[in-house]
């Protein structure tokens, strides 16, 4: 460890001074410097590069387990603990999660129009059986940008989304319209959301009724009833929007689009579906 420290910093301080400060001889250091590296050391160096490449490709969002899964997919045999060690050595840390901003109580209501039929069963045996929905907000210098999304619990794929400067019913309606357009008119589909006025609005309820969608809603004030949706928005903010400053809503809108359509759906490894991306999970299921 001492010789490694000297090798790393001898371009900053004189080698002799470093050796004296650490209590080692210059001869010993140069002998260590010229000895052949072990096979393990060479292997670690090659793997360090691949670990870092996977981490950076995820926009610095992957922890050791997802990086490890990336490497296994590429045919690189290595252990999870080794990946953890190499990430520590390079100070590669996934961004910490931030708390979601509290919702505006003026836009929520307590009167449910539907019971909680999902009942926290966040799995689906087939596509287009269970969709979950909600919206969140992203701050810009122009004000809030509201982001609505619809997720298929079968693959955790974002099948519909919408963005607007206001959180009117049209915001969530447009997200559901996109989901139906992408996936086709559903058959025996359960749609779960909270009790927000957007989802209880006549406009949104009529869209669901016209398409034969069964409505399910969380209990009042219980975020765990839609925990999978909360998890997606937490990932969006942790991995993309939470550490950025947007000058305009259009800039934020483009970045959210990029996160959903170019990273989350096609690339991001999801623990719930075996550490593959939503689109890859659907491909393996024969849907692509």
Q: Can you say where each PLM-predicted feature lies in the sequence?
A:
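Charged DNA-binding/catalytic regions of mobile-element recombinases
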Residues: 1-288
